[in-house]
Design a protein with these regions (language model features):
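N-terminal acidic leader/helix
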Residues: 1-40
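Solvent-exposed beta-strand sheet faces enriched in polar/charged residues
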Residues: 75-77
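Acidic, low-complexity, intrinsically disordered interaction modules
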Residues: 25-67
Length: 77
């Protein structure tokens, strides 16, 4: 699973940042992900996955805190 967030910073920069690659296995077999545990739990939580609006609202807050700028859109694929 990949999570990308469209962002706009206070300095006027904007773009899309890839913030997670989930279920990618290393050579040693360990899975990698680049999200804080709190956000990872929300991605994994069925309640958030079935209620997209609530999931996006909650994740945008956490992701913006991590990335440090305003999040306009979150895409998961």
């Amino acid at each position: 699973m990949v999570v990308e967030a469209k962002f706009e910073s206070d300095q006027g920069l904007e773009g899309i940042v890839r913030i997670a690659e989930i279920n990618i296995e290393n050579e040693d077999g360990k899975k990698e992900y680049a999200l804080e545990k709190e956000v990872w739990n929300k991605l994994s939580d069925k309640e958030y996955n079935t209620n997209t609006d609530e999931w996006e609202k909650e994740c945008k807050l956490d992701i913006s805190r991590i990335v440090g700028c305003n999040i306009e859109d979150v895409t998961v694929y």
